[in-house]
């Protein structure tokens, strides 16, 4: 779990996002591979706060409101919860609206052990 003070600082953008991964246009398998590499690389560089942009899904009729179903926004949280990646992660959740909302995931990584 994440400290409420830290979460407040993240939401208010008082803590800088160290790195961003944009998965727009990627297939599921490619996205999983890119996320694994992104998490591991940022952990090794001791980057703590990162953002993964999944997108919100295809728009199926904007005139009728949002009807998109994003495959990646369903799959990537499962990937982050995996045994392979969970050891690097303290916390993750969908980003606040001012950072992409449900089309992006904020991830707070553990400190690198040296």
Predicted regions: what they are:
Residues 1-49, 53-114:
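Long, charged, low-complexity intrinsically disordered regions
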């Amino acid at each position: 779990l994440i400290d409420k003070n830290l979460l407040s600082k993240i939401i208010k953008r008082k803590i800088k996002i160290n790195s961003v991964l944009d998965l727009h246009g990627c297939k599921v398998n490619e996205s999983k591979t890119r996320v694994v590499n992104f998490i591991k690389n940022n952990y090794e560089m001791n980057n703590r706060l990162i953002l993964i942009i999944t997108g919100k899904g295809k728009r199926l009729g904007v005139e009728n409101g949002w009807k998109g179903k994003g495959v990646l926004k369903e799959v990537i949280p499962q990937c982050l919860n995996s045994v392979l990646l969970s050891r690097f992660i303290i916390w993750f959740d969908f980003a606040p609206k001012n950072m992409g909302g449900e089309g992006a995931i904020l991830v707070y990584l553990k400190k690198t052990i040296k």
